[in-house]
Amino acid sequence: MAVTITKRPPRLTLQVLDIAPETTAIRCLDWDRDRFDIEFALENGTTYNSFLIKGERIALVDTSHAKFGDRYLEQLWQLVNPSDLDYLIVSHTEPDHSGLVKDVLVKAPHVTVVASKVALQFLGDLIHQPFTQQQVKNGDRLDLGKGHVLEFVMAPNLHWPDTILTFDHGTQTLFTCDVFGAHFCNDDPFDSEPELLAPDFKFYYDCLMGPNARSVLSAFKRLESLPPVQLVATGHGPLLRHHLDQWLESYRNWSQEQAKAATTVAIFYAANYGYSNALAEAIERGTAKTGVVVEKMDLLTAEPQDIRELTEIAAGIIIGTPPTTAVAKTALSTIRAAAHAKQAIGVFESGVADAEPAYPLLNQFRDAGLVPSFPVIRVTAAPTDALFQEAEEAGTDMGQWLLRDRTVKQMKALDTDLDKALGRLSGGLYIITAQKGAINSAMLASWVAQASTEPLGVSIAVAKDRAIESFLHVGDTFVLNVLEAENYQPLMRHFLKRFPPGADRFAHVKTYPASNGSPILADALAYMECTVVSRLDAHDHWIVYSTVDSGRVSKPDGMTAVHHRKVGNHY
């Protein structure tokens, strides 16, 4: 008898509570969300936090994700009459926080939207209707009455170019949207159990804030002029009150460590222009996973001095083709004047017909002595997953190229005797293959071991800068192909090749699909279909633990290929 399993709808709940005088939090709890953006796997769901401040005038700080729609709006209008709402503060325009802005304005069209210049530009394109707006800059204030004086702090690139933070002098509450957040969903609205929150807090920082460490430190510098913060009202996860100093100090320390790194990549792009935002983020992910510091800057709004300073300190420069406007041409001229020979350079198209041509732009920098680290990323249609994979891998290629000398030095620095002793650890030879929709990846691996018997499980050490890393998050599936001792050379040679960004790893390789969709290598000795259960951070590697769901041996008398080393400083 066939059994049909119907996927149950995700659990979505609301939590309303007072967090400070005349200040109410509306927390939208998404218990079952398991992925946030293409690279961000979630183990503990997430929350979308929105806040009401009721002085003599009333302000709403951020809305929520559109998936909460009617239930959020019903709760909001129970807390405040639409005619009494005066301001809507948009911390930034990412849809998980601004997804219901248009709905709020439909019910309360008189409301003044308060945001940064860039955010107001984005909103105009998002909601397609006129609205009353108030642009704010760093240090601007908005007096709601009853002591609730709101001061705005500019925080670009945390993690969008339009981000602002809002400080209420009356309650000493800092509303931070994405900053200091965590994708962690539970009933406790505060950070009462730091040991439970800490892993997700760090993972969130690494994925979203770490790549912009210098911007984090700049935000801390701007916050120094404010009175002491008593409560951080985050946009995701628990609000930070009980262990606030610990969380803030962690952010500061992590960012200082990142900023001290000698290698920085600057990504210049035209925000909200074609597909610039999405492609810049994909390149940023790939670059950051190599360990370099990444700074993004909007060519259309950044000050020339900031563009020049970032260009001068960067070891690598990546440019998204901007419009052919006077502002953009001035920005490009500033980059060209500040760039110097031996810097790495890369260019990606924005997908807009009248954008600055990519190839002449790249050639200008090449002629000045800069070194292209990846081919121009072409955009001839709406981006696909394959294009985003190409962009991410291009960023990884630049990061690896910039760190090549440091990697060699680290290998040579290992004690000789210890190096030789580690080299006596041997392992089998395997190829990990993975497929997500139309995109795929593969990696030769030898640091593989059985890790459990109940359930059956394996562990694999995967370097953080490997392309396949983004295919091995919790819940992802893959195939572990075992190479045969008598027939491993052709497959090993093929998968040891350095593939250009976005290249098909399986071209001219005989495969057939596993039940989980990943490729099985026809010439492998055996294969196992696996599901990722957890990941352990091991400094420059992830230890990926996965359950084994099924498997098969193609040659019962065959033996596994073994990789014997003599030194331990490389695979």
From Swiss-Prot:
One of its GO terms (molecular function) is FMN binding. Residues 43-236 are annotated as: Zinc metallo-hydrolase. By homology with NorV in E.coli, may be involved in nitric oxide detoxification. This is Putative diflavin flavoprotein A 1. Keywords: Electron transport, Iron, Metal-binding, Oxidoreductase, Transport. It comes from Thermosynechococcus vestitus (strain NIES-2133 / IAM M-273 / BP-1). Its cofactor is Fe cation. CDD domains: flavodiiron_proteins_MBL-fold (cd07709). It holds the Pfam family Flavin_Reduct.
